UniProtKB/Swiss-Prot annotation:
This is Adenine phosphoribosyltransferase. InterPro entries: Ade_phspho_trans, PRibTrfase_dom, PRTase-like, UPRTase/APRTase. It catalyses: AMP + diphosphate = 5-phospho-alpha-D-ribose 1-diphosphate + adenine. It comes from Acidobacterium capsulatum (strain ATCC 51196 / DSM 11244 / BCRC 80197 / JCM 7670 / NBRC 15755 / NCIMB 13165 / 161). It is found in: Cytoplasm.
Length: 181
């Protein structure tokens, strides 16, 4: 599904470096650091994400560790919303709620401060990349556990062939750069 917005993001693909056989043989890695260092490209990316959510009364943007921390604060600023980090275990100083989820080889855990979300707050969850959707699915569980209302899931890049968006049939999944292989 291609995004609908007035910022033409297709040229931004030329700023994304591809690295074959990383992190292991047979994987083509889409490296966004080359996009991030381009001030105009980064600004266009944030503007396009923000355009999708302006007027939707967003209270908070949640960024998932680690690269969600790059996009989250910038998006929150553009939406006049607060920013909340979703962290790996034992990184937050106050009381937290956590969710453990399965990975290809093992499991991982995410945490959020238990007072980070007030019931009914409208929230956008943001990460750099949508692949299989496992990390975002865990974050959705955290938000719902705290009573937040999910206004959308935002990604800079989506690997369409991994079908991660199929995990979220009832949510607004918004990705800017789509790759089919």
């Amino acid at each position: 599904m291609q995004p609908t917005h007035s910022v033409n993001c297709e040229p931004l693909k030329s700023l994304v470096r591809t690295v074959p056989d990383f992190p292991k043989p047979g994987i083509l890695f889409y490296d966004i650091t080359t996009l991030l260092k381009d001030r105009q490209g980064f600004a266009k990316l944030i503007d396009a994400l923000a355009e999708h959510y302006i007027g939707k009364n967003i209270d908070l943007v949640l960024g998932i560790e680690a690269r969600g921390f790059i996009f989250g604060p910038a998006l929150a600023y553009r939406l006049n919303a607060g920013f909340v980090p979703v962290r790996k275990p034992r990184k937050l100083p106050a009381r937290t709620v956590r969710v453990t989820y399965d990975l290809e080889y093992g499991s991982d855990t995410l945490e959020i401060h238990e007072d980070a979300i007030e019931p009914g707050q409208r929230i956008v969850l943001v990460d750099d990349l949508l692949a299989t959707g496992g990390t975002m699915e865990a974050t959705v569980k955290l938000v719902r556990q705290l009573g937040g209302e999910i206004a959308g899931l935002a990604f800079a890049v989506e690997l369409d062939f991994l079908k991660g968006r199929e995990r979220f049939p009832d949510l607004d999944v918004f990705s800017l750069l789509h790759y089919s292989e």
